[in-house]
Design a protein with these regions (language model features):
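Short coil/linker segments at helix-helix boundaries
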Residues: 65-98
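Residue-level recognition of tetratricopeptide repeat
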Residues: 19, 53, 106-107
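Short coil/turn linking the two alpha-helices of tandem helical-hairpin repeats
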Residues: 32-34, 61, 66-77, 120-124
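Structural marker of alpha-solenoid helical repeat scaffolds
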Residues: 15, 49, 102-103, 137
Length: 142
């Protein structure tokens, strides 16, 4: 289904290559199909055109975050792999923090990734803050 969605997005972009909504849709499909590098490049182009596009920051942040999570699931973690995971979390961080600033009402989307990043990067003050927000959110949405 996602392949056909990608085909539709590509056809829409053939008709109107400058349409931001079509480009954003394609970036989301790329994110959901694990084409992280392509997603990042497309979203960076979107941000260059309009740096207030919250969802573009979210997609880039999740592209880096998802790569870190996938690497973290591997049983045998070498020192190099652990370093790569930390690098991916660090690359994800500014995009997810920017998304949080641009879309504060979207807690369901940014709270868990930021929680995980702050925890793994040992960011005590930020972790304490996000832990409180996460607990409040969870208590209000039961």
């Amino acid at each position: 289904k996602l392949d056909s969605a990608l085909n539709i997005a590509n056809k829409a972009l053939e008709a109107d290559s400058t349409n931001i909504m079509f480009q954003y849709a394609k970036s989301t499909i790329l994110l959901n199909t694990g084409h992280y590098d392509e997603c990042i490049k497309l979203c960076q182009k979107l941000i260059e055109k309009d740096d207030s596009l919250a969802e573009a920051y979210y997609n880039i942040g999740l592209a880096y975050f998802n790569q870190a999570i996938e690497l973290d699931k591997v049983q045998q973690k070498s020192r190099d792999k652990r370093k790569r995971i930390m690098t991916l979390y660090k690359e994800s961080l500014p995009y997810l923090e920017k998304y949080r600033l641009l879309a504060p009402e979207q807690k369901a989307q940014w709270v868990s990734p930021l929680y995980t990043i702050y925890l793994n990067l040992n960011m005590g003050k930020e972790f304490d803050e996000i832990d409180k927000i996460k607990n409040e959110y969870r208590n209000n949405h039961r």
